[in-house]
Curated annotation (Swiss-Prot):
Descriptive protein name: Glycoprotein
A Pfam family recorded for this sequence: PH_Rhabdo_glycop
Top-level taxonomy: Viruses, Riboviria, Orthornavirae, Negarnaviricota, Haploviricotina
Family matches, as Gene3D superfamilies: 2.30.29.130
Organism: European bat lyssavirus 2 (strain Human/Scotland/RV1333/2002) (EBLV2)
Transmembrane portions of the chain: 460-480
């Protein structure tokens, strides 16, 4: 990509062009003019910035974006939901057993989720066993509650990572995003109170595989870093660069929108939120290749124009336009004054809008002012038309304009439009439909005697039973008393015979037979 350095130089203006790309170069310092011979004409070197004076080169390694890097960085993960399964068993008076299963939630710990995920991915039977219902137990006239805690793993669950701050985005995250996963906080909260999200790899930074390591040479002047020569041998300036972290790695965003992992440029400030990094894809590489061919063609056109000037010993404004320097820095400017070829030292700057060059009709902004013309002639082929308009004979090629439009459109969005806050899970106490789980560590709780009735019915039955029992006791006591009384009133058969009373002849009752005999014997 030989044009990458040219584009970098084009964008290394003395004034910061935030998020914009230059379309032309104009001298900000110009003069004085002096006559020259046509043999002093030369085509400018547009490959490097000549005014930085960075001559000390030191070999170093750096990282840059991979070719083919796309905006969306996918991070594979899984959701982990904690579920408590209760097996409630009641055995009634006749031994009939009733078992009821209930499921509730709990918030699982990250370590338990990581272990369960490892079991599931490794095919360990412990994971499937942990999902089984607890084995119920029973006791006569008692309610036995057996609980089992489980964690349900659902995978894959893919999130999108923002390369700028490593923020994760997904519809299931709380508020649609997660500030990132680290050793301190190894999970992300979700819209479900009892579900957490964790990356498949404990170190999610490995998902940010967008960099490649390259070797180059640092260019310094008096110990101060002012640029570097990349792996392709192209010089890139750090003028106008700003500091920017990608996937947690510190680096510099150059003015052409590219990014390199250079960190020791002390004068640079942090990039503003709208200064994004250009996508380095195959399309832009293809366009850059075509632009490089276009620049070679421009160089050949300049040499052809120069050869034509030398051969014909004549010059025109159009031919002078080929000699303009296309990148910021020191160069030459040429004009024709009173039919004399003139040359001046110039320092070129890049401009991003044509209004920066022609702010009003008839005004060519150069050197910080409306530059005066000589009989309708400015310099570098720029002239004044008869109706008073400034005419610039050349602009950047259509191919370069296409590349500029591509760079302006191919930027990484600061936030990914994937968060959908309308998706919320239920938050009731029962387990949702997506949960089918129940886990280890069985706990048994045996209640007291329970007839399986509601509380008021139970107290009512106890009261009725107490009254019935009291009535039964009273009835039994009454029966016993009556039986005892009957036994006491009934005489002995022998005594009954002895106690039979008779009536004497005199009419008086005789209590016994013996008395009767005595009485009758005396009378005789």
């Amino acid at each position: 990509m030989p044009f990458q350095a040219v584009l970098s130089a084009l964008l290394s203006a003395l004034t910061l062009c935030v998020g914009k790309f230059p379309i032309y170069t104009i001298p900000d310092k110009l003069g004085p003019w002096s006559p020259i011979d046509i043999h002093h004409l030369s085509c400018p070197n547009n490959i490097v910035v000549e005014d930085e004076g960075c001559t000390t080169l030191t070999v170093f390694s750096y990282m840059e974006l991979k070719v083919g890097y796309i905006t969306t960085i996918k991070v594979n993960g899984f959701t982990c939901t904690g579920v408590v399964t209760e097996a409630e068993t009641y055995t009634n008076f006749v031994g009939y057993v009733t078992t009821t299963f209930k499921r509730k939630h709990f918030r699982p710990s990250p370590s338990a989720c990581r272990d369960a995920y490892s079991w599931k991915t490794a095919g360990d039977p412990r994971y499937e066993e942990s999902l089984h219902n607890p084995y119920p137990d029973s006791h006569w006239l008692r309610t036995v509650t057996t609980t089992k805690e489980s964690v349900l793993i659902i995978s894959p669950s893919v999130a999108d990572m923002d390369a700028y701050d490593k923020t994760l985005y997904s519809k299931i995250f709380l508020n649609g995003k997660c500030s990132g996963v680290s050793q301190v906080s190894p999970f992300c909260s979700t819209n479900h109170d009892y579900t957490i999200w964790m990356p498949e790899n404990p170190n999610p930074g490995v998902s940010c595989d967008i960099f490649t390591t390259s070797k180059g040479k640092k260019a310094t002047k008096d110990g101060k870093l002012c640029g570097f020569v990349d792996e392709r041998g192209l010089y890139k300036s750090l003028k106008g660069a700003c500091k920017l972290k990608l996937c947690g790695i510190s680096g510099m965003r150059l003015m052409d929108g590219s990014w390199v992992s250079i960190q020791n440029h002390d004068e640079a400030k942090w990039c503003s939120p709208d200064q994004l990094v250009n996508i380095h894809d195959f399309h832009s590489d293809e366009v850059e290749h075509l632009i490089a061919e276009e620049l070679v063609k421009k160089r050949e056109e300049c040499l052809d124009a120069l050869e034509s000037i030398m051969t014909t010993k004549s010059i025109s404004f159009r031919r002078l336009s080929h000699l303009r320097k296309l990148v910021p820095g020191f160069g030459k400017a040429y004009t024709i004054i009173n039919k004399t070829l003139m040359e001046a030292d110039a320092h070129y700057k890049s401009i991003r809008e044509w209004t920066d060059v022609i702010p009003s009709k008839g005004c060519l902004m150069a050197g910080g002012r409306c530059y005066p013309h000589h009989n309708g002639v400015f310099f570098n082929g720029i002239i004044l038309s008869p109706d008073g308009h400034v005419l610039i004979p050349e602009m950047q090629s259509a191919m370069l304009q296409q590349h500029i439009e591509l760079l302006e459109s191919s930027v990484i969005p600061l936030m990914h439009p994937l968060a959908d806050p309308s998706t919320i899970f239920k938050k009731d106490d029962g387990a949702e439909d997506f949960v089918e789980v129940h886990l280890p560590d069985v706990q048994k709780q045996i209640s007291g005697i329970d007839l399986g009735l509601p509380e008021w019915k139970r107290y009512f039955l106890i009261g009725v039973s107490a009254l019935a029992f009291l009535a039964l006791m009273i009835f039994i006591a009454a029966c016993c008393r009556r039986v005892k009384r009957k036994k006491r009133a009934k005489p002995n058969p022998v005594e009954l015979i002895r106690k039979v009373s008779v009536t004497s002849q005199s009419g008086r009752p005789i209590p016994s037979w013996e008395s009767y005999k005595v009485e009758t014997g005396g009378q005789s």
